[in-house]
């Protein structure tokens, strides 16, 4: 009688039990997969951390200047959480190696800056696109109202601005060490400016002995604009219009400066044609601009008059150059030397360069290690570095070759700075950059390298057999005045 009976809910409960039974392995497998993923993530992060540590002992491959801001702490996709770099626009980064297509390994150039993960240009572009999509979805009332309230720009102008915005890369490749360039107080090639700058060159050569390369550059570096070097059409126009400095010579000089900077020594350029910061603003050199500034135009006039009639004939052009420099905003320069005494100005510059030296040299790796030409293949077309062997070009050998004449003249000028009087100057400028340093642009061999010279304490020793070199110094400039 019970065979045909039906118990309500029995079949349903059986089915339910079967369903619940078969669903348990699915839940267990989900948990297992989650654990596997977490384990794999920890393994990848551990390997990334190890690679980060190994990178501390690797040389700098190249350097970049940032055009955007980035906060690595907020980036959840960083290979090691909390190990992303933070930087603002116009900061400098030393790149050690490539970790992946989205990440590099390097450090922010600052004191105490540690090795960290740096987003690649592809990564930054991806972030920018996501932010734009998010902004379009959410809508920005303030921006919409602004657009409605103002007149639309002409189509051509709008397209031009859009094109410029689209073509600004997140990074610009720059020398691993920013080259130091002196400007002021007036035009190079005239005695007052040359003497004051030569005093600083001599000081730097001995203060940073073994850590500095001082090299002469005669090519017009103002032609080394990124837009020109990357545009064959503009390059041809400039080569036709420039009688004194071809673009090929400029390109060669840029490559030489990049090569010098790879050693992570301080690089100082005795650049003949650079008299204003705007001349290098659009180049890839990212220089440290040092403004040698006198206290007033009257002081500069007195200094020029003290050099005799040959310099007085060109007083007007020198004063015009001085006016252009003092009209520049302070942010145009990295260092302004406005001290009234040479020793104070030298110490000011030395303190700045010591801080920069510590910022560019991470404690772990050796400061003199040379990096490979390029660790990132994707940036080879952006870099201005050529494949160069160990041999220097004739111009480079000439610039870096120690010159006995130049060295002895520098020592004599430096030694005499504490002995000669500055009676030609007014009392308010009594000890300011004593009138002792003759124009240094007579040397065809350029300034010698800091390496291999006598230590600074030997500069105080008198060497009477070379006194006649100082007295018989030739004042004739080797180049026409109109080239300045």
From Swiss-Prot:
Chain positions found as Phosphoserine: 152, 393
Pfam families cross-referenced by the UniProt entry: Guanylate_kin, VGCC_beta4Aa_N
Transmembrane parts of this sequence: none
Principal subcellular localisation of the protein: cytoplasm
Keywords: Calcium, Calcium channel, Calcium transport, Cytoplasm, Ion channel, Ion transport, Phosphoprotein, SH3 domain, Transport, Voltage-gated channel
Domain SH3: 59-128
Region Mediates interaction with the alpha subunit, residue ranges: 195-345
Biased composition (Polar residues): 409-420
GO biological process: calcium ion transmembrane transport; calcium ion transmembrane transport via high voltage-gated calcium channel; calcium ion transport; calcium ion transport into cytosol; cellular response to hypoxia; chemical synaptic transmission; detection of mechanical stimulus involved in sensory perception of pain; negative regulation of detection of mechanical stimulus involved in sensory perception of touch
Record bears the keyword Lyase: no
Composition skew (Basic and acidic residues), residue ranges: 388-399, 463-484
InterPro entries: CAB1-4_N_A-dom (IPR046937), CACNB3_SH3 (IPR035760), GK/Ca_channel_bsu (IPR008145), P-loop_NTPase (IPR027417), SH3-like_dom_sf (IPR036028), SH3_domain (IPR001452), VDCC_L_b3su (IPR008079), VDCC_L_bsu (IPR000584)
Tissue expression notes: Detected in brain.
SMART domains per the UniProt record, alphabetical: GuKc
GO molecular function, one term: high voltage-gated calcium channel activity
Quaternary structure note: Component of a calcium channel complex consisting of a pore-forming alpha subunit (CACNA1C) and the ancillary subunits CACNB3 and CACNA2D1. The channel complex contains alpha, beta, gamma and delta subunits in a 1:1:1:1 ratio. Interacts with CACNA2D4. Interacts with FASLG. Interacts with CBARP; prevents the interaction of CACNB3 with the alpha subunit CACNA1C thereby negatively regulating the activity of the corresponding calcium channel.
PANTHER family for the chain: VOLTAGE-DEPENDENT CALCIUM CHANNEL BETA SUBUNIT
Family, similarity comment: Belongs to the calcium channel beta subunit family.
Protein name per its UniProtKB record: Voltage-dependent L-type calcium channel subunit beta-3
Source organism of this protein record: Rattus norvegicus (Rat)
């Amino acid at each position: 009688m019970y065979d045909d009976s039906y118990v309500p809910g029995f079949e349903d409960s059986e089915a339910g039990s079967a369903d619940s039974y078969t669903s348990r392995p699915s839940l267990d497998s989900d948990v297992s997969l989650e654990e596997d993923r977490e384990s794999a993530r920890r393994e990848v992060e551990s390997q990334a951390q190890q690679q980060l540590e190994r990178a501390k002992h690797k040389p700098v491959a190249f350097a970049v200047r940032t055009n955007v801001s980035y906060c690595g702490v907020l980036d959840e996709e960083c290979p090691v959480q909390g190990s992303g770099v933070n930087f603002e626009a116009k900061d400098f980064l030393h790149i050690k190696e490539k970790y992946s297509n989205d990440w590099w390994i390097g450090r922010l150039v600052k004191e105490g800056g540690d090795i960290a993960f740096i987003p690649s240009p592809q990564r930054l572009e991806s972030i920018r696109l996501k932010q734009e999509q998010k902004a379009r979805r959410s809508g920005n009332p303030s921006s919409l109202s602004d657009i409605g309230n103002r007149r639309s720009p002409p189509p051509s102008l709008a397209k031009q601005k859009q094109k410029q915005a689209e073509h600004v890369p997140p990074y610009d490749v720059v020398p691993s060490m920013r080259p130091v360039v002196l400007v002021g107080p007036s035009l190079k090639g005239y005695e007052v400016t040359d003497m004051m700058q030569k005093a600083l060159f001599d000081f730097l050569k001995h203060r940073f002995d073994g850590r500095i390369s001082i090299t002469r550059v005669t090519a017009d570096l103002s032609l080394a604009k990124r837009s020109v070097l990357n545009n064959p059409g503009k390059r041809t126009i400039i080569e036709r219009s420039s009688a004194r400095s071809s673009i090929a010579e400029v390109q060669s000089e840029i490559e030489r400066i990049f090569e010098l900077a790879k050693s992570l020594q301080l690089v100082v350029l005795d650049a003949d044609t650079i008299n204003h910061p705007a001349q290098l603003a659009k180049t890839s050199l990212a220089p440290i601009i040092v403004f040698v500034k006198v206290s007033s135009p009257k002081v500069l006039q007195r200094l020029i008059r003290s050099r005799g009639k040959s310099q007085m004939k060109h007083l007007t052009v020198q004063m015009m150059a001085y006016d252009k420099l003092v009209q520049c905003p302070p942010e145009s320069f990295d260092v302004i030397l406005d001290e009234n005494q040479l020793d104070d100005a030298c110490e000011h510059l030395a303190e700045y360069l010591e801080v920069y030296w510590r910022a560019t040299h991470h404690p772990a790796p050796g400061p003199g290690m040379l990096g490979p030409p390029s660790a990132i293949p994707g940036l080879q077309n952006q870099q201005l570095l050529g494949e160069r062997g160990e041999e220097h070009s004739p111009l480079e050998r000439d610039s870096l070759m120690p010159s006995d004449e130049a060295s002895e003249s520098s020592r004599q000028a430096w030694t005499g700075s504490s002995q000669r009087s500055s009676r030609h100057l007014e009392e308010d400028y009594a000890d300011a950059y004593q009138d002792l340093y003759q124009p240094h642009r007579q040397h065809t061999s350029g300034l010698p390298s800091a390496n291999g010279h006598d230590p600074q304490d030997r500069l105080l020793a008198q060497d009477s057999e070379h006194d006649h070199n100082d007295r018989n110094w030739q004042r004739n400039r080797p180049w026409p005045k109109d080239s300045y």
